[in-house]
Amino acid sequence: MGQGESTPLSLTLDHWKDVKTRAHNLSVEIRKGKWQTFCSSEWPTFEVGWPPEGTFNPSIISAVKRIVFQETGGHPDQVPYIIVWQDLSNSPPPWVPPLAKIAVASGQDNGRKSAGGRPSAPSRLPIYPETDSLFLLSEPPPYPTSPPPPPAPHAARPAPGLMAEGLGSEGPAAGTRSRRPRSPTGDTGPDSTVALPLRAVGPPAEPNGLVPLQYWPFSSADLYNWKSNHPSFSENPTGLTGLLESLMFSHQPTWDDCQQLLQVLFTTEERERILLEARKNVLGVNGAPTQLENLINEAFPLNRPQWDHNTAEGRERLLVYRRTLVAGLKGAARRPTNLAKVREVLQGPTEPPSVFLERLMEAYRRYTPFDPSSEGQKAAVAMSFIGQSAPDIKKKLQRLEGLQDHSLQDLIKEAEKVYHKRETEEEKQEREKKETEERERRRDRRQEKNLTKILAAVVSEKGFRGRQAGNLSNRAMRAPREGRPPLDKDQCAYCKERGHWARECPRKKNARETNVLTLGD
């Protein structure tokens, strides 16, 4: 889409690689699904002006950050995400245009609200139209005592007049409850930045009474965003479990909303497993899971109950139902014990030890019924962490003295030391280059040595052939002599007789004897 229709959230999702790099530079880990969930669903409920499509407004980001960092009632799991948002606002990357060109809350809220707090008419069509072919679901009927629902349910197409005016600003939140025109209740209408099925519509009727709630059903855009941005429950149950756990706390869904979420986000087999696990987790009078059918049906009914959300009893029953449903989600997420799957989780060549430990603990949660963070399982997790780490880290950890006394945090510190001391890619290339040069030098030396031997052999053979050429005339004489039998120790080489050697042979002396002239001669 064009730059004029971009939102802060869509920009960050389109450039997610840059956002991940910035988070890595800040030494934090973020995930795409949670990034979108917190921006579009969680932070708008803080009532500080955060729009579901996100914003780079520093004041709004600081307000959200103060709530996230609260000592009591804070949200530690959201700390990395708001830190990255603030860093993007303080040091915007090149792909972030000026604030005036983005649909941020600071520029839109002033245009939405007129005197008296009423929102002005939006100007753009929603990105996700209200489709009735995506989810063939009927709108849950309103409770008897609640005010009538808005005239445009999520299963019906918008009227032509509304289509001409537009149903909301651009961004993934367009067309959701939070971006729809509010009901004609004047100043008593709910805040447009809060997307809750049950929302306060005015002060209590009595001084100590309950605040009346108005029912706003989920829209198809909400369901479409949640379904498309999270993996299936069978593939990775953590994503949808975290989403529904967050929705139960922030959106306060009714029984009908819970059934709609189960119908859209889960398959038939997954729904049956979740409901079965939830009914196993219904608490009895003593606070322990009960097996009494009447208590189970009362706390977690399978058929639509007549609970009034504007009474204390109805709200309490809805609260118990939501808690039980979350317990069922967590129970259904556990699979039969399969330690082979846990052993398949190995540390990657460039994977940080902390990220590897998180994957390992997630495998324990998915493929075993154990809680890896419990005291009884820390030893098993530690041994798996050591045995399945990278070879250099594994070698270092196995050499630690008193290994049984080290905690997981200690092992992580030691693994981080080895990880950060690894040679960089440039150092690795330089080392490989030096090793290649050294191998080539050794090969050249071997070749030179072999060549020297060959030359020496050639020279010696030439000398031998020269000696042979000089003695060609004696070849006939040498041939018989070479064939003579060897002499004995006391045998003469000249006369072949025994008892003397050739230099003492009398025959040889006689042959060489010459006449000596005397004075008389």
UniProtKB/Swiss-Prot annotation:
InterPro entries: G_retro_matrix (IPR000840), G_retro_matrix_sf (IPR036946), Gag_P30 (IPR003036), Retrov_capsid_N (IPR008919), Retroviral_Gag-Pol_poly (IPR050462), Retrovr_matrix (IPR010999), Znf_CCHC (IPR001878), Znf_CCHC_sf (IPR036875). Residues 139-153 have a biased composition (Pro residues). A zinc finger (CCHC-type) spans 490-507. GO terms for biological process: viral budding via host ESCRT complex. One of its GO terms (cellular component) is viral nucleocapsid. The keyword Methyltransferase does not apply. A motif (PPXY motif) lies at residues 140-143. The record marks Y128, P129, L196, P197, L455, A456 as: Cleavage. GO terms for molecular function: RNA binding; structural constituent of virion; zinc ion binding. Keywords: Capsid protein, Host cell membrane, Host cytoplasm, Host endosome, Host membrane, Host-virus interaction, Lipoprotein, Membrane, Metal-binding, Myristate, Phosphoprotein, RNA-binding, Viral budding, Viral budding via the host ESCRT complexes, Viral matrix protein, Viral nucleoprotein, Viral release from host cell, Virion, Zinc, Zinc-finger. A motif (PTAP/PSAP motif) lies at residues 119-122. A lipid is attached at G2 (N-myristoyl glycine). It comes from the Viruses. SMART domains: ZnF_C2HC. Residues 107-126, 136-195, 420-447, 467-490 are annotated as: Disordered. Residues 479-490 have a biased composition (Basic and acidic residues). RNA-binding phosphoprotein p12 is phosphorylated on serine residues. Koala retrovirus is both a circulating virus and an endogenous retrovirus of koala, except in some isolated populations in south Australia. PANTHER family: GAG_P30 DOMAIN-CONTAINING PROTEIN (PTHR33166). This is Gag polyprotein. The gene is gag.
